[in-house]
């Protein structure tokens, strides 16, 4: 499980202001910000915040731990991608996804699929809008959730109300969003047509393939 697993909310990343004042956090934040000519106070605060949060989520609570954590170049690159993703879209859902990906890069074996997916995810996140995330959320829900509790109409309706409807409001239908996701290798167009009923049957066989 990752840093946010099972909490239902964001972790509180500091008990006192000195976390944001850490010399290592300041150095990593400044290194990122120095790439840009115009930096607002708001952006400075956002980058210091997400930098401190990134170290906290991988279990680094002292500067010696932080220095050791960013020794590998790959981790430094991942941290910069976390900063870039959050700077582009300083939203709670982007924060949660970026921190989970950073955690996976640091703690999962380099040869694991989870590690490699996290590396690629952080690279494309700065280019994803809220609409892109809505599309991906619904795709992942229906293709991979395979919720074993959906055994009748009542439980499925509860599932839809809880997990699907929050994404439906303003759901993007414009083709460019889907083309962009394909270009960024977040999705891939299939050569054959797959009916929605088939996806539901594969994901929730107890409900949509029941023959009792």
Which residues does each predicted region cover?
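Eukaryotic partner-binding/assembly regions in large regulatory complexes
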Residues: 15-123
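Short amphipathic alpha-helical interaction segments
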Residues: 92, 165-212
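Non-catalytic, well-ordered alpha-helical scaffold segments
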Residues: 92, 96-99, 115, 119-122, ...
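Short acidic/histidine-centered micro-motifs embedded in hydrophobic/aromatic stretches
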Residues: 100-101, 139, 184
């Amino acid at each position: 499980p990752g840093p946010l697993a099972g909490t239902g909310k964001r972790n509180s990343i500091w008990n006192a202001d000195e976390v944001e004042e850490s010399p290592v956090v300041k150095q990593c934040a400044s290194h990122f910000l120095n790439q840009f000519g115009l930096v607002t106070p708001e952006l400075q605060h956002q980058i210091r915040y997400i930098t401190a949060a990134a170290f906290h989520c991988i279990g680094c609570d002292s500067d010696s731990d932080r220095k050791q954590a960013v020794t590998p170049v790959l981790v430094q690159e991942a941290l910069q991608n976390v900063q870039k993703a959050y700077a582009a879209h300083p939203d709670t859902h982007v924060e949660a996804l970026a921190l989970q990906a950073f955690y996976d890069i640091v703690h999962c074996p380099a040869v694991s699929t989870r590690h490699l997916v996290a590396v690629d995810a952080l690279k494309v996140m700065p280019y994803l809008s809220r609409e892109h995330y809505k599309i991906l959320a619904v795709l992942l829900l229906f293709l991979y959730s395979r919720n074993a509790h959906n055994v009748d109409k009542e439980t499925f309706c509860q599932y839809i109300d809880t997990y699907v409807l929050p994404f439906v409001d303003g759901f993007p239908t414009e083709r460019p969003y889907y083309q962009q996701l394909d270009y960024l290798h977040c999705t891939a167009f299939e050569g054959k047509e797959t009916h929605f009923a088939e996806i539901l049957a594969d994901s929730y066989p107890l409900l949509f393939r029941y023959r009792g």
